[in-house]
Amino acid sequence: MDKPVLKDSLRLLSSLGKITSRSMFGGFGIFIDDTMFALVVQDKLHLRASDETINLFKEQGFEPYVYKKRGFPVVTKYFAISPECWDEPDSILIQAVVALDVAKKDKEKQKSAGPSRIKDLPNLRLATERMLKKAGITTVEELKNTGSVNAYKAIQQTHSSSVSDELLWSLEGAIKGMHWSVISAETRNELRKQL
């Protein structure tokens, strides 16, 4: 299938960095260095808007991309540029630079904010969050302050059935922001000794 808008967009935006595209939202997300800042869907290039640029996009007559999720419309932060913009590719590039900057800043904010709930940490699920809550640990900050060993001990004390060593590795990985399987054997032995 020929996708001229996608090809033209990738060609135009490639000067911004290492460009890739992935299928998403019924179209293709456009990424520079793993940061999505544009979307090609319904044969239109959409650029990511920020709180500052959203009004500018609306003034220019750009429409947000809307898709349905469970039957309800979801309005995205991606606005379709008008076909006339293709007559001035430099103006698209200028807006794309702003869109990329916005996307990078949003990505950094998300990274630094971190998960707000325990279940959103690596390795942990809702069941683990409930076990920790029963043990008196209700927030991500409390878990980090308690530490994996003490959190594991608290779960052992409040749980009638036995809990596996894997839970200890999962807690340690969650606190460190990594998958439990990459925790070294040395660290696992140190943690086991503290039990």
Curated annotation (Swiss-Prot):
Question: Could you mention a single GO BP entry for this protein?
Answer: establishment of competence for transformation
- Positions in coiled-coil regions: none
Q: Which UniProt keywords apply?
A: Competence
- Establish whether keyword Iron-sulfur is in the entry: no
Mutant phenotype after disruption: Defective in DNA transformation.
Q: Which InterPro entries does the record cross-reference, listed alphabetically?
A: TfoX-like, TfoX-like_gammaprotbact, TfoX_C, TfoX_N
Q: Which domain of life is it from?
A: Bacteria
Q: Which SUPFAM superfamilies match?
A: YgaC/TfoX-N like (SSF159894)
Described purpose of this protein according to its UniProt entry: Required for efficient DNA transformation jointly with TfoX1.
Q: Which family does the record assign?
A: Belongs to the Sxy/TfoX family.
Q: What is this protein called?
A: DNA transformation protein TfoY
Q: Which gene encodes it?
A: tfoY
